[in-house]
């Protein structure tokens, strides 16, 4: 499961996600990717499930980049405990994702395989996504 090796603080405030992604919104490594269209928290397990779905469909061809990392700690109080008495214990980590943020990138496979692989990955994620292609990608000459 994805999580930071060490954090400065064990607990963090929930915060508020507003606006679109200012960074991580351009394809940097691959020719294809999926981009988030809404604000959501994505857990490390969801990221890993999506990554496995992509690599299995691509049959270990090409390369996959995960552009988000769950570094925000989430706390939870035990069951049947009254409100108050401090913040709960850390339960796991999430990656806050805003609209426009790239989640996965792929390189080294043909267009149709990349599109289907990323569609399978998108089904594992709690956000609505959009398939994106590099602007200078040559659709006629698909030399993957």
UniProtKB/Swiss-Prot annotation:
Keywords: Ribonucleoprotein, Ribosomal protein, RNA-binding, rRNA-binding, tRNA-binding
GO molecular function, one term: tRNA binding
InterPro entries registered for this protein in UniProt: Ribosomal_uL16 (IPR047873), Ribosomal_uL16_bact-type (IPR000114), Ribosomal_uL16_CS (IPR020798), Ribosomal_uL16_dom (IPR016180), Ribosomal_uL16_sf (IPR036920)
Region (Disordered): 1-22
Positions with biased composition (Basic residues): 1-16
Domain of life where this protein originates: Bacteria
Pfam family, one: Ribosomal_L16
GO terms classed as biological process: translation
Cellular component per GO, a single term: cytosolic large ribosomal subunit
Family: Belongs to the universal ribosomal protein uL16 family.
PANTHER family associated with the record: 50S/60S RIBOSOMAL PROTEIN L16, LARGE RIBOSOMAL SUBUNIT PROTEIN UL16M
Subunit (UniProt): Part of the 50S ribosomal subunit.
Known function: Binds 23S rRNA and is also seen to make contacts with the A and possibly P site tRNAs.
Protein name: Large ribosomal subunit protein uL16
Origin organism lineage: Bacteria, Pseudomonadati, Bacteroidota, Bacteroidia, Bacteroidales
Gene encoding the protein: rplP
């Amino acid at each position: 499961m994805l999580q930071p090796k060490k954090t400065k603080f064990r607990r963090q405030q929930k915060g508020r996600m507003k606006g679109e992604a200012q960074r991580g919104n351009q394809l940097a490594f691959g020719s294809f990717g999926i981009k988030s269209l809404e604000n959501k928290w994505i857990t490390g397990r969801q990221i890993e499930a999506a990554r496995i779905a992509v690599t299995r469909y691509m049959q270990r061809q090409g390369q996959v980049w995960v552009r988000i990392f769950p570094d925000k700690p989430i706390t939870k109080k035990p069951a049947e405990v009254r409100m108050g008495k401090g913040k709960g214990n850390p339960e796991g980590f999430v990656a806050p994702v805003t609209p426009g943020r790239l989640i996965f990138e792929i390189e080294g496979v043909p267009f149709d395989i990349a599109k289907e692989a990323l569609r399978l990955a998108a089904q594992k994620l709690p956000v609505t996504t959009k398939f994106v292609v590099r602007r200078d990608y040559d659709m006629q000459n698909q030399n993957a």
